[in-house]
Regions:
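N-terminal extracellular ligand-recognition/capping segment immediately after the signal peptide
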Residues: 81, 348-429, 444-449
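Feature marks extracellular polysaccharide-active and adherence modules
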Residues: 344-346, 393-395, 416-418, 426, ...
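Predominantly extracellular beta-rich ligand-binding scaffolds that present long acidic/polar faces
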Residues: 497, 503-610
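Compositionally biased, low-complexity/repeat regions
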Residues: 1-340
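Acidic glycine-/aspartate-rich tracts in secreted/extracellular proteins
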Residues: 310, 395-398, 588-590
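Surface beta-loop-beta hairpin patches that serve as ligand-binding interfaces in beta-rich domains
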Residues: 310-328, 596-676
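Short, glycine/acidic-rich beta->alpha junctions
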Residues: 89-93, 103, 354, 358, ...
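Detector for repetitive beta-architecture
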Residues: 387-389, 395, 403, 412-414, ...
C-alpha cells in the first residue's frame, strides 16, 4: 500500500489541525481516514489481480480457472497446475513419471520399468550392461532382495511390475520429518531414548535432496527405515556384536543438522561419526558397556548407549515418518510479530530482560513486563492476536512450571515452539489464568494437561501427548465458561464436564487405547484401554468435531461431527440435538443423534494403532474400504482427511497412463509399511 495519505493532497491550511485540540474529532479527519481505508482496500484488490495471473501466487478460487487454461480439470491442485507444462514436455521418461507421482501425492516415488526387472533373452544388439544372470549373489546389492530396490530379475507375471510391458510408479506413503537437537531421555547406565517422550521410535534414512528431472536411483533417495540390511547394502560394514560402518559409508556423511541417518552431541560437543556402533540397547538389564570412545545406536528402538568418554547431556538429530501434518513434529508456527510482549525461553542463551531459561520464569517475566508498562491496556487486546507470546526457542526438555494460577493483566497468551524446533514440557502442565485465553502450540507434553476453572479459552495446536503413558487432557469440573479447542493434535483421553460451550476438535487423533511400538522381544507398552471422551466427574461435555479419529468410546451430552471416525462408537445423552454427517459411527447400537450418510460397517482398517508409528491411525490405502471415499468432499474420513491421501492416489491412477509410452500398461503400487 502507498505511504501517501489523502490528507497530503489538501492544502496545508485545511489539512493541519488547529493549535488547540477540539473537544471532538474533526469531521474532516474522519472523512480522510475513511478515504484512506477505502483506497487501501482498492490497492490490495489491484495487487491481488496481478497475483492472480500466476499459479504460484493466485488465490485459491483462481486455481481451477488457470487449470482449465492448461487442460487440467477443476480439482487439480496448485502444484499440479504449476508443473503441468514441464511434465508434459518430458512425457514417456521414468523421471517424469516419478515427478508426476510426487506432485500428485506428495510422496517419494520410484519408476520401475518392467523390462528392466524381468528375465528375457538378451540379443547382441541390446545395449549394455549384459544380463548374464537373474541376480548376482556376490554383489552387495543382494541385501536389497525383497525391497523396492532389489536387483533380481524375476519371471514374467501377467500383472504387477514384473512384466516387460509394464511401467510402475512405486510410492512410499509417508514423509519424513526431522527432530533437530532433541534432548534424549536417560533410562539408566548411560543409556538414552532419543524420542522426546521417551518412547521407542525406530530410525529412518533421510532421502538425498533431488534436483529437477533426476531419478530415485538408490536407497539413499527413499524414506526407508534404517535396518541392518540397509546398512549392508549401502556400503562396507565391519561385523561383530556391534557393527561399525566403513569410513566411506554414505550414512556417515552429511551436515550435522541434516544427517542421512543420525547425528549426536554429548555435552554440546559433536560425537564423531566414526565413534558410532550399531547394536542392541535393551531397556532391562544393562548390556556390556561400550568402549569409552564409542556410542552404540539401536536402530530398531531409537536408543543409544554412550561410552564413559563422552559427557552427559545427549542431543540427537534424526528422522521420523508421518502421514499428515499432525502433532508437534509437524508444527511450523511462525512467530507473531504483532505480539505486545515477547519472552523467549532458551537454555543456551545468556539470560536478559526478554530471555530466560525456564517456562516458569518466562510466565513470571511476561506478567511483570505487562504490569510495568502502563501503555499495555487490556481493552486494546485484539482477537486472533496474542498480547503475550512465550517462544520456546529450544528442542530441550523443559521442566514444567508450578501450577499457573493468577489473574493476568492482558487476556491473550500464546506459548509456541518456532518452526524446526520441538521442545518438550517434561511433566504435567496446570494452567488457570483468570479470564485468559491461552494457545499452546507445537510442543511435546510428557504429563497431563490440567485446565482450571478460571480460564476463558484454551486452543491446542500441533500438540503431542503420550497416550501410551495414560496422559490426558483434564478440565476442571467447574470450568463452566471454558472454550476448549484443538487443531492437528495427537491427544490422549479428554476428561471434561458439561459446560456452556462444547469441545471443538479439528484434524486430531484422540487415543484412548494407548498402544505403543515395541522392539523385537520387548513387551508391548501401554495400559488398559479407556474412553476417548468422557465426563470428568458429573456429565459428559458437548462435542463438535471435524476430521477426527476417536480411538475409544465417546460419551457426550450432544455431538455434532463431520468426516470423523468413532472406532468404538459414540453415545450421546440428548440425541435430538446435533448431527453426525459422513462419519463411521461404530457397529454398536448406542444412542446417538441424527446421522446423514454415516457408515456402521465395515470396521476401519488402519495401518497401525500404535503411537509414533508412521501410519498411526491412518486408514490403510491398499485395501478397498469405503471409508476412503466416505467424507463430505469424497476423500477419506478421520484425522488424515486434511492430507487428501486417497484423493491424490486416485488422481495419480487416473492420470498415470498419460505419461507412459503407447502400448505399455501403467501401474501404481505402494511400498510396504515399515512399522505396524
Amino acid at each position: 500500500m502507498s505511504a501517501v495519505r489523502a490528507a497530503d493532497w489538501l492544502p496545508g491550511a485545511l489539512r493541519d489541525a488547529p493549535a488547540e485540540p477540539p473537544a471532538q474529532p474533526r469531521l474532516l479527519d474522519a472523512l480522510l481516514s475513511a478515504i484512506d481505508r477505502q483506497r487501501a482496500l482498492l490497492e490490495d484488490d489491484i495487487d491481488q489481480v496481478y497475483e492472480d495471473f500466476f499459479i504460484e501466487s493466485c488465490a485459491e478460487w483462481a486455481i481451477p480457472y488457470i487449470a482449465a487454461l492448461v487442460g487440467l480439470p477443476a480439482d487439480a491442485g496448485r502444484a499440479e497446475v504449476a508443473s503441468a507444462v514441464a511434465l508434459r514436455r518430458r512425457k514417456g521418461t521414468p523421471a517424469a513419471l516419478e515427478d508426476l507421482a510426487e506432485v500428485l501425492t506428495g510422496w517419494t516415488a520410484l519408476a520401475v520399468e518392467g523390462w528392466q526387472v524381468t528375465l528375457w533373452a538378451q540379443r547382441l544388439g541390446h545395449p549394455p550392461p549384459p544380463r548374464a544372470a537373474a541376480v548376482d549373489l556376490r554383489s552387495r546389492a543382494r541385501h536389497r532382495l525383497g525391497t523396492p530396490f532389489e536387483p533380481a530379475r524375476r519371471c514374467v507375471t501377467p500383472s504387477g511390475r514384473w512384466n516387460p510391458r509394464t511401467a510402475t510408479a512405486l510410492l512410499w506413503p509417508w514423509q519424513l520429518r526431522t527432530l533437530r537437537a532433541a534432548q534424549a531421555t536417560a533410562i539408566g547406565d548411560r543409556r538414552y531414548t532419543l524420542h522426546p517422550l521417551g518412547v521407542d521410535a525406530p530410525l529412518y534414512v533421510r532421502p538425498r535432496p533431488r534436483a529437477l528431472a533426476t531419478r530415485t536411483a538408490s536407497q539413499l533417495d527413499a524414506p526407508l527405515r534404517a535396518g541392518y540390511r540397509v546398512l549392508e547394502s549401502l556400503g562396507d560394514v565391519e561385523y561383530g556384536d556391534r557393527w561399525r560402518l566403513g569410513p566411506e559409508h554414505p550414512l556417515l556423511a552429511g551436515a550435522p543438522d541434516a544427517p542421512p541417518l543420525i547425528s549426536l552431541t554429548a555435552g554440546n560437543a559433536p560425537v564423531p561419526p566414526e565413534a558410532l556402533r550399531f547394536g542392541s540397547v535393551p531397556g532391562g538389564a544393562a548390556p556390556p558397556a561400550p568402549a569409552a570412545d564409542e556410542v552404540v545406536v539401536d536402530l530398531a528402538r531409537g536408543r543409544v548407549h554412550v561410552g564413559d568418554g563422552f559427557a552427559a547431556g545427549i542431543r540427537a538429530t534424526f528422522h521420523r515418518p508421518v502421514s499428515g501434518r499432525l502433532g508437534a513434529l509437524a508444527g511450523d508456527a511462525p512467530a507473531d510479530v504483532g505480539a505486545r510482549v515477547v519472552v523467549t525461553v532458551d537454555r543456551d542463551a545468556t539470560p536478559s530482560a526478554f530471555v530466560v531459561t525456564t517456562i516458569e520464569a518466562a510466565i513470571d517475566r511476561a506478567e511483570q513486563l505487562c504490569q510495568d508498562d502502563p501503555e499495555l491496556r487490556p481493552e486494546d487486546s485484539l482477537p486472533g492476536r496474542p498480547d503475550v507470546e512465550i517462544r520456546l526457542a529450544t528442542s530441550d526438555r523443559l521442566p514444567p512450571p508450578a501450577p499457573v494460577a493468577f489473574a493476568p493483566k492482558l487476556p491473550r497468551w500464546r506459548i509456541v515452539a518456532p518452526a524446526l524446533l520441538t521442545p518438550t514440557i517434561g511433566g504435567t502442565l496446570a494452567l488457570d489464568l483468570e479470564g485468559a485465553c491461552v494457545t499452546l502450540e507445537g510442543v511435546y507434553l510428557r504429563g497431563d494437561l490440567e485446565l482450571g476453572a478460571g480460564l476463558a479459552g484454551v486452543e491446542l495446536v500441533n500438540l503431542t501427548m503420550n497416550p501410551v503413558a495414560g496422559r490426558a487432557v483434564l478440565v476442571s469440573p467447574d470450568a463452566w465458561g471454558l472454550a476448549l479447542g484443538a487443531r492437528r493434535c495427537l491427544l490422549g483421553p479428554v476428561r471434561a464436564d458439561l459446560a456452556a460451550l462444547p469441545i471443538r476438535l479439528t484434524d486430531c487423533v484422540v487415543d484412548g487405547h494407548g498402544l505403543g511400538l515395541a522392539g523385537c522381544g520387548d513387551p508391548v507398552p501401554g495400559g488398559a484401554a479407556t474412553a476417548a471422551i468422557d465426563a470428568r466427574e458429573r456429565f459428559a461435555p458437548g462435542l463438535v468435531a471435524d476430521g477426527v479419529t476417536f480411538a475409544g468410546p465417546v460419551s457426550a451430552e450432544t455431538a455434532q461431527a463431520v468426516d470423523c471416525v468413532f472406532v468404538d462408537g459414540v453415545e450421546v445423552v440428548r440425541g435430538g440435538e446435533g448431527c453426525l454427517r459422513h462419519c463411521y459411527v461404530g457397529p454398536e447400537p448406542l444412542p446417538r443423534p441424527t446421522t446423514y450418510r454415516c457408515l456402521t460397517e465395515p470396521v476401519p482398517r488402519f495401518v497401525s494403532e500404535r503411537f509414533e508409528a508412521g501410519g498411526y491411525y491412518a486408514l490403510d490405502l491398499e485395501t478397498d474400504q469405503p471409508l476412503l471415499t466416505a467424507a463430505s468432499d469424497g476423500g477419506e474420513v478421520g484425522a488424515y482427511h486434511h492430507a487428501r491421501r486417497a484423493a491424490g492416489l486416485n488422481r495419480l491412477r487416473r492420470r498415470i497412463h498419460e505419461f507412459v509410452p503407447l502400448g505399455l500398461r501403467a501401474e501404481v503400487e505402494m511400498a510396504p509399511w515399515e512399522e505396524r
